[in-house]
Amino acid sequence: MPVITLPDGSKREFAHPVSTLDVAADIGPGLAKACIAGRVNGELKDACDLIETDAELSIITAKDEEGIEILRHSCAHLLGHAIKQLWPQTKMAIGPVIDNGFYYDIDLEHKLTQDDIEALEKRMLELAKTNYDVVKRVVSWQEARDTFAARGEEYKIAILDENISKDATPALYHHEEYTDMCRGPHVPNMRFCQHFKLMSIAGAYWRGNSENKMLQRIYGTAWADKKALSTYLARLEEAAKRDHRKIGKQLDLYHMQEEAPGMVFWHNDGWSIFLELERFIRRKLNQYTYQEVKGPLMMDRVLWERSGHWDKYSEAMFTTSSENREYAIKPMNCPGHVQIFNQGLKSYRDLPLRMAEFGCCHRNEPSGSLHGLMRVRGFTQDDAHIFCTEDQVQAEVSSCIQMVYDTYSTFGFENIVVKLSTRPEKRIGDDAMWDRAEEALKQALRANNIEFTILPGEGAFYGPKIEFTLHDCLDRAWQCGTVQLDYALPSRLGATYVAEDNSRQTPVMIHRAILGSLERFLGILIEEYAGRFPTWLAPMQVVVMNITDKQADYVEEVVKFFKEQGIRASFDLRNEKIGFKIREHTLRRVPYLLVVGDQEMENKEVAVRTRDGVDLGKMRIEDFAAKIHQQISLRSLKLLEE
């Protein structure tokens, strides 16, 4: 007689084995109707799976994050069901859940079109609206193989042969005449899978191996109700409007071309923003007492072998040779910084030593993964490495955390998710060292009143790590900042200092990045601001326009004054209507549009309006310059009078 303990501590006793669905029905018909699956003693189970002994049970519904993930997985099976009805010759590969949706890789000679996708979506909805039950059968390995062999499903057979033990009992999920294989769980009925949309088609190699056949990958999204789906699609539409590639072209910030894949050609205005970001971080480095250094772009293979990168990372490194020596273009800055540390004898009195670089790095990312500024091959990293004693770790990490939050808040990012990755199974050092390292990171986070999630076993083999993920205005997550302890690299590269007792000791190395890749962070900012940069970042802060030729000399005089004040200003003296000029510079997202007519010229004033169309009236040029200077020095995210 199993006794079921529910999350509120209440218990229910049954005279026979029961399923999660049975328990839900015993509680009430509403919960039975909403039940998708169950978490039994911490493990997700199908709603139909029997519970034979005493257990703790949480009933999963579409209100739970796990419930949404399950219905998305079931939508992938629904997609398979529809595909096999429309194209019976299709061979099904894999159909996992991804962020906000799912995909299915299929082998079909017919190249799917947008019309086909619409037909597929229509058939999926027709099937889902019949509210058929999903039937689960647990079978032997051989029966599963025979089932898929009879259907000609060679990819399912390959999964069984290569990934599943012959002693296993795979679960088959029957969607009427369609059968799929999965660990589950899945929804018990297709009434849960009626709010979805197929999004796109792409190519994908089987097993991710370019030597295998190219399959077609169909992406979809699925949600618990119509409102959630509509909200997500509206967010995607807004994201498309904010696409940094589109805005980058509109504002003439940068371009990329086939002859240099993953490399950025910065144009004047884009480079202006890039340099402003650098200047901002450089001020932070000075505030937090860092040295700024510059290491070579390319170093001998021997050094990369000593650091361990050649063995672990060589596939992502660009290499070249000269005079019988092999070189690698650096993918990261850390080995170079250790070389700088090693020049000259270091004492414990020199520590902590904080070393920063705007390092130009290159990584040989797969061409298919490149995406505008977000995924490139050549990038600048706001990298820093702190050499310190073990006793100094907590204070230094705390300082890094403060710098991260100080920096992100300047750009308007307040929603930061923090994760602490702890010791993996394969690691250097003893448990005592890891205990101290992990506790130092925890204490630093707690000292700054930061909530964090622990990711057990996700740390690097050489030390634990803190990751900072910022959420933008569309609630998309961007992992940017990291603070990583390293107990291995200084030792591998011979870094030592003289301790207080005159012994030679190896320093702890803290890897620290805040923006990460400046290119990627600039892409994030373009999308966050939709190209409407705050005044301090805007490549052109002010444009001054005349109404007639009579004001041309005065306009040039005003612009000259602004430039002398350090304000990025330009003029527009074209023989065009003032409304046309205002519209054009509004589309260029220039923060302030200044208009000069006869009256303004006579009174040494300018008529000020913002790119949002707010009329700020007439101001003396000295007064306007003072207001702008204050806004820039405060790095305000708002325009005047907002």
UniProtKB/Swiss-Prot annotation:
Catalytic activity: tRNA(Thr) + L-threonine + ATP = L-threonyl-tRNA(Thr) + AMP + diphosphate + H(+)
Top-level taxon: Bacteria
Name assigned to this protein: Threonine--tRNA ligase
Similarity comment: Belongs to the class-II aminoacyl-tRNA synthetase family.
Major subcellular location class: cytoplasm
Cofactor(s) annotated in UniProt: Zn(2+)
Family matches, as InterPro entries: aa-tRNA-synt_IIb, aa-tRNA-synth_II, aa-tRNA-synth_II/BPL/LPL, Anticodon-bd, Anticodon-bd_dom_sf, Beta-grasp_dom_sf, TGS, TGS-like
Subunit structure: Homodimer.
Residues making up the signal peptide according to the UniProt record: none
Organism: Shewanella oneidensis (strain ATCC 700550 / JCM 31522 / CIP 106686 / LMG 19005 / NCIMB 14063 / MR-1)
Residues bound to Zn(2+): C334, H385, H511
Chain positions covered by the region annotation Catalytic: 243-534
Gene that this polypeptide is encoded by: thrS
Enzyme nomenclature, EC number: 6.1.1.3
Function: Catalyzes the attachment of threonine to tRNA(Thr) in a two-step reaction: L-threonine is first activated by ATP to form Thr-AMP and then transferred to the acceptor end of tRNA(Thr). Also edits incorrectly charged L-seryl-tRNA(Thr).
Residue span(s) of domain TGS: 1-61
GO MF, one annotated term: metal ion binding
